[in-house]
Amino acid sequence: MAGRGGSQLERRRERTPDRGRGSASHPPGRESPSPPPLPLKRHTYRRVVSDQEEEIVVVSENSRSPSPQEQPPPPQQPPKKKPRKTKHVPLQDVSQDSEDEREAEEELGAVGFSYPPVRITGKDGKRSFETLNENDPLTKAASAKMAVTNPLSLPIVSAWEKGMEIMNMLMERYRVESDLKSNFQLMPEQGEVYRRICHLYINEEHRGIPLTFTSNKTLTTMMGRFLQGFVHAHSQIAHKNWESTGCALWLHGCTEVEGKLRCLHGTTMIQKEHMIEMDVASENGQRALKENPDRAKVTQNRWGRSVVQLANNDARCCVHDAGCATNQFSSKSCGVFFTEGAKAQQAFKQLEAFMKAMYPGMNADQAQVMLIPLHCDCNHKPGCVPTMGRQTCKMTPFGMANAEDLDVDGITDATVLASVKHPALMVFQCCNPVYRNSRAQNAGPNCDFKISAPDLLGALQLTRKLWTDSFPDTLLPKLLIPEFKWLAKYQFRNVSLPAGHAETSRQNPFDF
């Protein structure tokens, strides 16, 4: 019995199945393992002596009652696994709680504008949706704050849209014609719209503005170019191979040494004898007789016609034109030629004194910088092919008659004194004005571009005033005019490049 008792203490226990295959109370239906073997019985012999006899008793080791000191430790039992507890997810309370209780329990993510309204909440990284009543305070707050954004009222981010916004305001303000306004797309070749805006501005704000050797059309044309440059600078539009103003800042250095002039190459111009013959009835012939009575005379040419012959011993030309005849230029020439070197230097001094009078803070180096137009109306279009003749505007010094007779002491305006002390102005004309009256069939293009250096500077000032008058709350953008640097593309061209004529109806030129 003792052996059976020991075996009962070490009886087999149920094995807990693996996770996911059941619990201890419901083991899976599989064959149970065999019980471990019973320990071997060890017999001991004990001698029992009584008063009359001696008896040997066989006592089993398992049946001995050990002493308290010799009691073996209880067998170690395997640790019991704690049963898994099933988590019951509480159902969402759909009762109508107060607004404070909702904010305390969950974080409100949004309130949709659907019908019926939906309350979107987020908690522990999860989103839940709840249908709200129309009278709920959250619904009223969402209807007031969550308005649908109109796409047409989004902030302007495109450069083209910024430029079109400015131009639409200008065209509306100065009442530009409807056909120009409807076809305007902020393209580089649409300079006529800018010129029209400046023309209307001059007629309204500065009617009767005094000009010297400058046509009204050229003044508004240059103002339109500057306005286009301001619009492009404001909208951050940049062109790779085209400059909207068509101008450059030229450090001429023609006033440093008396009697020394420089051409566009930056080299010193050479002195050359020059003889001019003009028709007696022409405007140039009459002007030569009035301005230079000591050097101009009326004679007969080799064909027997009466002409005004003007001899210039102080003519200046480019170094590359030293071996060329009168009005002839080499292929390396810059096209700069002055019939009177002293008058040309006087014109440069006049502009320098004129700018110092308007801007007293200028230093000597800044006063020698001259704003010059490089392109006239003939070659200002983007992608224009070089034509025959001069590639830059022609510079001609014009003398101001009767300016020397004015009393210097009676004039207080410093800008006027600059012209009195230096009675000559540098005038910029078409690149090739000689083609205007030419009867040759292969004559190049020409235009009536004509503006003096002081009026060109005045065109820039008027354009700035137009911007500030039209947009008082908008900062005047910074207009970037490049510094002049001599390039091979400015060379005089004696031969025009061949140009093709589009013929879209044929794929083969020899398809007769």
UniProtKB/Swiss-Prot annotation:
Q: Which HAMAP family does the entry mention?
A: ADV_DNB2 (MF_04054)
Record field: compositional bias (Basic and acidic residues): 9-21
Which species?
Human adenovirus E serotype 4 (HAdV-4)
- State its role: Plays a role in the elongation phase of viral strand displacement replication by unwinding the template in an ATP-independent fashion, employing its capacity to form multimers. Also enhances the rate of initiation. Released from template upon second strand synthesis. Assembles in complex with viral pTP, viral pol, host NFIA and host POU2F1/OCT1 on viral origin of replication. Covers the whole ssDNA genome during synthesis. The complementary strand synthesis induces its relese from DNA template. May inhibit cellular transcription mediated by the interaction between host SRCAP and CBP.
Region annotation (Disordered) maps to 1-105
The Acidic residues compositionally biased stretches are 96-105
- Any coiled-coil regions, as ranges: none
Q: What is this protein called?
A: DNA-binding protein
- What gene is this protein a product of? DBP
List of residues binding Zn(2+) 2: C376, C378, C430, C447
* Biased segments, Basic residues type: 79-88
Which keywords describe this protein according to UniProt? DNA replication, DNA-binding, Early protein, Host nucleus, Host-virus interaction, Metal-binding, Phosphoprotein, Viral DNA replication, Zinc
User: Which residue intervals make up region (C-terminal arm, DBP binding)?
Assistant: 495-512
Q: How does it assemble?
A: Homomultimerizes on viral ssDNA bound to pTP. Forms a initiation complex with viral polymerase, pTP and hosts NFIA and POU2F1/OCT1. Interacts with host SRCAP.
